[in-house]
Amino acid sequence: MANTTSPRFTTTQWLIIIIASIGFLFDTYELLMTPLVAAPAIAELLNVPLNNSLVTDWVGRLLWIAALCGGVFGLCGGWLVDRFGRKRVMAASIFMYSLSPFCAAYATTLPTFIFFRSATFIGVCVEFVAAITWLAEVFPDKKQRERWLGITQAFASLGGVAVTVVSIWISSHGKDLPHMGLPLSLGATDPGSWRYLLMTGILPAIPIALLLPFVPESQVWKDRRAAGSLKRPSFAAIFAPELRRVTVVTAILSACAYGIAFGALQVTVARVTPGLPELKDQAKTLVPLRKEADALNK
């Protein structure tokens, strides 16, 4: 009777699983940070109220500029991982999307803020390509490969939960945090909470820097590079007569799905009702009047 058990993992495979899981988790963490910081950051950098039309206009511009940059460089991800290696590109992309939000936290102009947020999107999109490629090559067993590609990508869903929890905590405790040289808005005594949230984007760089020295480059990539077989297939091949219909339909459906998901994730309560903070302050001033009215009605 044939042995159908899957081969046991090596230390290298476990390390790559951990690195990929961290990468996917913080992919979503970094992306979903945008709807939380975009409006307050733009309002502060332009020195206008949150409900000013300029804020809405620039939030929209930020989203499409960052998404366009990420998409273009994501398309180049395949070439990059073939040219420079899976490990090197994945490390560079994770460090890029870790350091860029930290730099954005110190932005004092809108162009600088948009530049670093676009750099974050580029890092996320390239990291996704590198991680998928690296994982696929690490597991020669088909069942293990499919299982762990799914499991590691599932960590992306935790990124949204993590950034929400961190954002809530910073909103409650931001005034107690050290300033760390962060810029202040006009008339403010404490940095905006959005700056602290952006600073947390550097977190994935710490475990990656500690783990990567112990992980070798993909052996599959090294063997193919030595054999000179890394030449990528022609882009036109996927539009061959027998594949054209599948390619076009799949591309359209994928574009719609990603477009809807990306757009929906940017709609937060702060964007739907940008005047809530002002209404809260107005409600506080009405408390004494309500008490007087209640006393008169007794």
Map each language-model feature to its residues.
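Transmembrane-helix signature of 12-pass secondary carriers
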Residues: M1-K298
